[in-house]
């Protein structure tokens, strides 16, 4: 029986005030940018947080719509509207990715052009208080955030970079290119930023990001580094995980207070809903061992390899008939993985792996 190739598209959640809009960018041939909006009830105006997404490997039109629910829920509780734009060439946004290549500084600036278009749209929204804004970015989105901070809208009071950068593995001295990009940005930036990088970041370990950070500061940039040590099997996914909140939220909240942005919880209904509990680790097989998974054919094993590349909270489910499905991030990836699998498995699916542990046992049916 054929399985489901990964996670299904997630519909907007009305209980989070979530909607999807398409915003034109400002290029010679404009493209529509798929943009997720989370808003509290009421007319506003609300302070605004913009979150810039990372870059998956492969075809970026297949990249899921970014939501970053751990962060979105924290800001919603405090009365913010949250805007998460997919840049050109990503997910359902039109066109091809711009600024790709070893010119990492130019790549970040090309991505920042997309964000300038989104901010211009935000300025026209009656629900947005553009005097009180913050911007966060993860991975490629962190690079985008630092590039944007060179010429920001004056309403942005805080910029936060989570594991920001861009990495290439062939035909590129990307470590030097990243250092040069950060030096360039630091020389042109007059607003402070807060940076989070983990010890076991598979993309940007301390040996890479340390010199890049020093280049940024030496060039004149004002940045505070939070080196938070190891996180799970890969610190690069920290921001996407609810477990990561313990590392970054308090520090960001302190910075919000310093710049007179709101931090009091005014909408507690946006707190995270209870999620399905994970089964205990079974030790059935190492989670990375694709060949040990029972029941799956080639498509399912290929899907499992994709699953293994996803950071943060994740789950993979299988069924005796060959059905499979996975999910990562969001409020309840365990339940979503089972739901995805059971669209074909008809109730026979069981969890095989959760996060970095195998939970399947030989007694599972």
Predicted regions and their residues:
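Alpha/beta-hydrolase fold nucleophile elbow
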Residues: 127-138
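N-terminal cap/lid segment of alpha/beta-hydrolase-fold proteins
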Residues: 9-43
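The feature captures the conserved acid-bearing segment of alpha/beta-hydrolase catalytic domains
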Residues: 158, 164-220, 224
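Cap/lid segment of the alpha/beta-hydrolase catalytic domain
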Residues: 56-67, 74, 84-110, 237
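C-terminal catalytic histidine-bearing segment of alpha/beta-hydrolase fold enzymes
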Residues: 219-278
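Secreted/extracellular ectodomain signature
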Residues: 90, 243, 265-365
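Short beta-strand element of the alpha/beta-hydrolase
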Residues: 45-54
């Amino acid at each position: 029986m054929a399985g489901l190739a990964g996670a299904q598209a997630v519909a907007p959640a009305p209980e989070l005030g979530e909607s999807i809009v398409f915003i034109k960018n400002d290029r010679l041939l404009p493209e529509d940018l798929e943009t997720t909006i989370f808003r509290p009830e009421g007319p506003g105006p609300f302070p605004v947080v913009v979150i810039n997404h990372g870059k998956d490997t492969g075809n970026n039109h297949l990249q899921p719509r970014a939501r970053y629910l751990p962060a979105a829920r924290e800001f919603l509780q405090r009365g913010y509207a949250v805007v998460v734009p997919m840049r050109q060439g990503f997910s359902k946004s039109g066109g091809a990715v711009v600024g790709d290549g070893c010119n990492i500084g130019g790549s970040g600036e090309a991505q920042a052009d997309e964000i300038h278009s989104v901010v211009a749209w935000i300025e026209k929204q009656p629900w947005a208080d553009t005097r009180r804004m913050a911007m966060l970015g993860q991975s490629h989105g962190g690079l985008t955030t630092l590039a944007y901070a060179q010429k920001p809208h004056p309403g942005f009071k805080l910029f936060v970079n989570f594991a920001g950068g861009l990495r290439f593995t062939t035909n590129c001295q990307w470590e030097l290119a990243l250092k040069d990009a950060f030096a360039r940005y630091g020389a042109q930036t007059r607003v402070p930023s807060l940076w989070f990088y983990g010890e076991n970041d598979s993309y940007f370990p301390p040996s890479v990001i340390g010199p890049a950070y020093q280049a940024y500061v030496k060039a004149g940039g004002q940045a505070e580094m939070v080196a938070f040590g190891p996180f799970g099997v890969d610190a690069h996914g920290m921001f996407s995980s609810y477990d990561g909140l313990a590392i970054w939220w308090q520090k960001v909240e302190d910075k919000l207070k310093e710049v007179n942005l709101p931090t009091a919880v005014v909408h507690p209904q946006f707190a995270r809903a209870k999620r399905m509990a994970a089964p205990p680790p079974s030790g059935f097989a190492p989670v990375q061992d694709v060949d040990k998974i029972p029941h799956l054919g080639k498509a399912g094993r290929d899907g499992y390899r994709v699953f293994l590349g996803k950071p943060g909270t994740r789950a993979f489910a299988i069924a005796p008939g060959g059905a499979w499905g996975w999910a990562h991030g969001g409020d309840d990836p365990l339940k979503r993985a089972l739901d995805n699998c059971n669209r074909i498995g008809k109730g026979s699916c069981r969890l095989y792996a959760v996060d970095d542990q195998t939970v399947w046992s030989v007694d599972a049916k």
